[in-house]
């Protein structure tokens, strides 16, 4: 599928507006047009993280399936888990179009979508009806015009508690004004306290404890990373997701869209996001789970995230360039790489490159 996509499908899709092309890809998944890409079960890739058993460590990041339209078809592409959202309490249209830009020269994407989604009710109805057996996380956010953003996150926990495999508290999108301010220490402490208190209430009501992850930006300073790490460890948080898109444009090749406002993802994000991942692993120690995101485009880059401290990895933007066969190719490639290393489990490779990445300077 990836080869066919590279030679034929990509050229056709790239003639279409990126947002329309995304809609077509979702429609193709919904219709069953794309074939299932089965990956062989490899016990060396299976991971138990935050109490959940992941068949393999590769997940679809939030942002692709905003409204929970295709979690099942995504899992059938070979992903070990998927994440819907970001969803906000009320539907919102996001920022004006155009708002997605391909950086073909760099195999990157700039987006300034602004949490466009159909709201809690629509996504909840789809997840409830789907009754999926796989791991499906719910990425929750706040409405742009919300007067109480912390309350929006609390509402997300309450709304999806019965159907979410895990939650991601997304406070790191650069496209909602002021959202990243919630990463400041006092604001973060208040947010985590409120969200985790709601989790406690829902756990008592429904008799199950759903893991909660915090998704952070790659643009934090060393001091900002200190604050996030200390608050994460001070609260009953289940893990971190590192990282969201970046505002940096360092290293981009000349191109028509490199100056567009928004968050940069894809291959250009790999080094920065992996550096921040390793710095966070060094700060939080060995026990707090971390999901590594940003620039994963191959089995080698996925495994490098693990070496830099990730328990699991996610991708999205690189599939724009490689096609729907990418997840199965990565999982199969990771199996071969782990076998070559001669280890019993991929976990044995985690942290082996933390120092090399964490010693890099930011900015």
Curated annotation (Swiss-Prot):
An annotated Gene Ontology molecular function: dihydroorotate dehydrogenase (quinone) activity
Membrane topology reported for the UniProt record: Peripheral membrane protein
Any Gene Ontology biological process: 'de novo' UMP biosynthetic process
Positions with a binding annotation for FMN: 62-66, 86, 139, 170, 215, 243, 266, 295, 316-317
Binding residues annotated for substrate, in chain numbering: 66, 111-115, 170, 175, 244-245
Chain segments annotated as transmembrane: none
PROSITE patterns: DHODEHASE_1, DHODEHASE_2
Primary subcellular site in the record, as a coarse category: membrane
Described function: Catalyzes the conversion of dihydroorotate to orotate with quinone as electron acceptor.
Record protein name field: Dihydroorotate dehydrogenase (quinone)
Native species: Agrobacterium fabrum (strain C58 / ATCC 33970) (Agrobacterium tumefaciens (strain C58))
Taxonomic lineage: Bacteria, Pseudomonadati, Pseudomonadota, Alphaproteobacteria, Hyphomicrobiales
Gene: pyrD
């Amino acid at each position: 599928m990836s080869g066919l996509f590279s030679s034929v499908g990509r050229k056709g899709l790239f003639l279409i507006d990126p947002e329309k092309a995304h809609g077509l890809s979702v429609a193709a998944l919904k219709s069953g047009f794309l074939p299932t890409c089965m990956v062989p079960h490899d016990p060396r890739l299976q991971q138990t993280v935050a109490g959940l058993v992941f068949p393999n460590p590769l997940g679809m990041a939030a942002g692709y399936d905003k409204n929970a339209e295709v979690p099942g078809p995504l899992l059938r592409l070979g992903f070990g888990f998927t994440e819907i959202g970001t969803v906000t309490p009320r539907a919102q249209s996001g920022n004006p179009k155009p708002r997605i830009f391909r950086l073909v020269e760099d195999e990157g994407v700039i987006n300034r979508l602004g949490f466009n989604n159909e709201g809690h009710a629509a996504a909840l109805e789809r997840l409830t009806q789907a009754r999926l057996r796989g791991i499906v996380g719910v990425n929750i956010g706040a409405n742009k015009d919300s007067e109480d953003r912390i309350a929006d996150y609390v509402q997300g926990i309450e709304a999806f508690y019965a159907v979410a495999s895990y939650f991601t508290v997304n406070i790191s999108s650069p496209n909602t004004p002021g959202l990243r301010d919630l990463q400041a220490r006092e604001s973060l402490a208040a947010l985590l306290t409120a969200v985790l208190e709601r989790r406690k209430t829902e756990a008592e009501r429904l008799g199950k404890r759903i893991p909660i992850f915090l998704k952070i930006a790659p643009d934090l300073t060393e001091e900002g990373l200190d604050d996030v790490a200390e608050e994460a460890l001070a609260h009953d948080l289940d893990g971190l997701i590192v990282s969201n898109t970046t505002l940096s444009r360092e290293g981009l090749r000349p191109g028509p869209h490199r100056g567009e406002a928004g968050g940069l993802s894809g291959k250009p994000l790999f080094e920065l996001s992996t550096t921040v991942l390793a710095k966070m692993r060094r700060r939080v120690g060995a026990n707090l789970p971390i999901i590594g995101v940003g620039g994963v485009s191959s089995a080698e880059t996925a495994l490098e995230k693990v070496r830099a401290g990730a328990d699991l990895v996610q991708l999205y933007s690189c599939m724009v360039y490689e096609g729907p066969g990418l997840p199965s190719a990565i999982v199969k490639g990771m199996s071969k790489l782990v076998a070559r290393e001669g280890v019993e489990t991929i976990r044995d490779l985690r942290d082996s490159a933390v120092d090399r990445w964490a010693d890099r300077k930011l900015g």
